[in-house]
Amino acid sequence: MPEYRSRTTTAGRNMAGARALWRATGMKDDDFQKPIIAVVNSFTQFVPGHVHLKDLGQLVAREIEKAGAVAKEFNTIAVDDGIAMGHDGMLYSLPSRDIIADSVEYMVNAHCADAMVCISNCDKITPGMLMAAMRLNIPCIFVSGGPMEAGKTKLAEHNLDLVDAMVIAADDTASDETVAEYERSACPTCGSCSGMFTANSMNCLTEVLGLSLPGNGTVLATHADRRKLFEQAGQQIVAITRDYYEQDNVNVLPRSIGSKAAFENAITLDIAMGGSTNTILHLLAIAQEAEVDFDLKDIDRLSRKVPQLCKVAPNTQKYHIEDVHRAGGIYGILGELERGKLLDSSVPTVHSTTLSAAIAKWDIQQTSDDQVAHFYRAGPAGIPTQVAFSQDTRWPSLDGDRAQGCIRNVANAYSQEGGLAVLYGNIAADGCVVKTAGVDDSILVFEGPAHITESQDEAVANILAGKVQAGEVVIVRYEGPKGGPGMQEMLYPTSYLKSKGLGKNCALLTDGRFSGGTSGLSIGHVSPEAAAGGAIGLVRNGDIIRIDIPNRSIDVKLSDDELTARREAQNELGWKPAELRPRKVSAALKAYAKLATSADKGAVRDLSQLDD
């Protein structure tokens, strides 16, 4: 039977000093016999997805205490990718993921916590905490802050999100008044941005990974039903903590739940729902922490057989996350995948012995539980607010239409190939990633001359100045994990291509990455990156690039001899931008760049370099 980790600081005469300090935090005599559970919060007033989390850690803590354990809360950092977008602030976003993972490890191990509840929400916070959960391998449950409601305005027939505001702002034909109305309407409530962007994609994936409760990815931040998720997380973490330490049930540990099958289920869901390409980057990093052999080739294999069953903004203007919830949420999609024999539902979760049993209860197509139907009718109130759990609106009915609704069955899939694809070729020997869910059918095969830029700033300037022509492949290089450093998101370049009418007439190729809000022929994560000697650094203006998504290939039309000659010349010059960029790179970012791997490895730090 494993011993409670916390006994290191709470048991024995020699720990009198530690107990004295624990007492100063409010612990009493009988508390020293209880499990100590860390409540890992990420409240900040900088981020709309986290602005409402301040009191929610204590909500969870009170439930933990009612269930007979001790709760101790701490906070991590949280970067808002949308606010950090389009300037040097974005250099810090991806590195913050590893800082978050480290900070959770530091706090939990330093204080010998027995288990943890992770309260996350936005882009790098959920994956950072997932990395920590797999690294620590102690009982853990995730509960997110929830998605914001979609925006509404009389100026548009469809609901709005952040990307709509960005696109309209770059549209020269839009008046200042129209831009201001979109800006005021796009993000009406607290919560993670309302489309299937990175934050919501990752929170949905925690459900299929088995580390969160049903509805974690789709119940609105403003809805009263989400309060129940926080309360249940506090209760359930105590149950599984006792199950591990007192019954020796290792099946409740993150690495037991996060098996190879669970990671394959996660990417299967991601492909089926057309999630953000960032999820690939994060799943690869999380799998490494879990010591699971899961790589781009697994993702490539699954992308060829999993259909797209759900289409949500930014891939369509018709649906947002609130509509996915009305259609049965993530368990609605999982039910269709299970019926299509595309899921390994034998894996365990933190709330059910198997995923199959959970699907049987939570899939609206097969359950007879009226409470489940009531749960998935939770909808938006349309009232701007930063207050969690402030409304209890219900949709009048569920969206159970699997032929033409938000979630489709396999027979009526949006497409028989899923929403993500991995491409290989002489420009990306180790692969690159495209969100096919956002690519128009007319440009699934695309060939055009390269338009070289060596920073996101240069790409934006060229697009806005009208220098980018229809038919070109805009290359943004030296923006990878090392080269940026920090692997910036390219939401502004792709949004501006749209606003200039080039969304279906140009491609964008980068060793950087894309926001979950990106759509169009946007190919990122090119590996190896330019700064690591990748062939993307050898391409010149006018070189012809051929992209063939159906055949999963991407190549620059140059001979091997020409590429070899260019490589030899580049080796002499060094793998860096041709001209010095006006970019301030701090010591902290330089440290990240020194250890960072390319995107095909999840852009994690290669700590083996420290062994030399």
From Swiss-Prot:
It comes from the Bacteria. One of its GO terms (cellular component) is cytosol. Keywords: 2Fe-2S, Amino-acid biosynthesis, Branched-chain amino acid biosynthesis, Iron, Iron-sulfur, Lyase, Magnesium, Metal-binding. InterPro entries: Dihydro-acid_dehy_C, DihydroxyA_deHydtase, DiOHA_6PGluconate_deHydtase_CS, ILV_EDD_C, ILV_EDD_N, IlvD/EDD_N. Pathway: Amino-acid biosynthesis; L-isoleucine biosynthesis; L-isoleucine from 2-oxobutanoate: step 3/4; Amino-acid biosynthesis; L-valine biosynthesis; L-valine from pyruvate: step 3/4. It catalyses: (2R)-2,3-dihydroxy-3-methylbutanoate = 3-methyl-2-oxobutanoate + H2O; (2R,3R)-2,3-dihydroxy-3-methylpentanoate = (S)-3-methyl-2-oxopentanoate + H2O. [2Fe-2S] cluster binds at residues 122, 193. The modification N6-carboxylysine is found at residue 124. Its EC number is 4.2.1.9. Pfam families: ILV_EDD_C (PF24877), ILVD_EDD_N (PF00920). One of its GO terms (molecular function) is 2 iron, 2 sulfur cluster binding. Mg(2+) binds at residues 81, 123-124, 489. The keyword Lyase applies. The active site is at residue 515. The keyword Zinc does not apply. Belongs to the IlvD/Edd family. Homodimer. This is Dihydroxy-acid dehydratase. It comes from Teredinibacter turnerae (strain ATCC 39867 / T7901). The gene is ilvD.
